[in-house]
């Protein structure tokens, strides 16, 4: 577990995490509303697409796709999904073919996903601090 004391620390931590990602990784981001899931995803996307990339939250349209030179990044927000099957209407099977997948609010579809999965758990502490833990295949994914 890592305590992130500011937005800057969270940003740097997300960038470091992104350096360890590759095509075919599925990253599940968990945490309460306002925990920083979208912020964390933005830094991952910027790592691959460039810091000036216009990144839009997928909250309303459920999916944003970003192109990198070698693969696409599929950024899903499952907050408004009512049925796990709805993810297939959003091109999920296509996303599985050599792309990086980021899923916020993944609880509703987690049981449909094939391991290995990388889980990023964010929790708000006092004074805007965050507690972050990262797990892969039931083992702590520790790169620091």
Curated annotation (Swiss-Prot):
InterPro entries: P-loop_NTPase, T6A_TsaE. GO terms for molecular function: ATP binding; metal ion binding. It is found in: Cytoplasm. GO terms for biological process: tRNA threonylcarbamoyladenosine modification. Keywords: ATP-binding, Cytoplasm, Magnesium, Metal-binding, Nucleotide-binding, tRNA processing. The keyword Transferase does not apply. GO terms for cellular component: cytoplasm. Mg(2+) binds at residues 38, 104. ATP binds at residues 34-39. Required for the formation of a threonylcarbamoyl group on adenosine at position 37 (t(6)A37) in tRNAs that read codons beginning with adenine. Is involved in the transfer of the threonylcarbamoyl moiety of threonylcarbamoyl-AMP (TC-AMP) to the N6 group of A37, together with TsaD and TsaB. TsaE seems to play an indirect role in the t(6)A biosynthesis pathway, possibly in regulating the core enzymatic function of TsaD. Belongs to the TsaE family. This is tRNA threonylcarbamoyladenosine biosynthesis protein TsaE. It comes from Rickettsia prowazekii (strain Madrid E).
């Amino acid at each position: 577990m890592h305590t992130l004391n500011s937005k800057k620390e969270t940003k740097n931590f997300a960038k470091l995490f992104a350096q360890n990602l590759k095509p075919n990784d599925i990253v599940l981001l968990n945490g309460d509303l306002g925990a920083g899931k979208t912020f964390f995803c933005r830094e991952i996307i910027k790592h691959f697409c460039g810091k000036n990339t216009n990144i839009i939250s997928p909250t309303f349209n459920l999916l944003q796709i970003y192109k990198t030179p070698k693969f696409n990044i599929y950024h899903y927000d499952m907050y408004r999904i009512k049925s796990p099957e709805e993810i297939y209407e959003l091109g999920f099977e296509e996303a599985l073919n050599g792309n990086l997948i980021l899923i916020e609010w993944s609880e509703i579809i987690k049981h449909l996903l094939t391991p290995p999965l990388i889980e990023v758990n964010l929790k708000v502490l006092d004074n805007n601090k965050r507690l972050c833990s990262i797990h892969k295949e039931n083992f702590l994914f520790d790169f620091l």
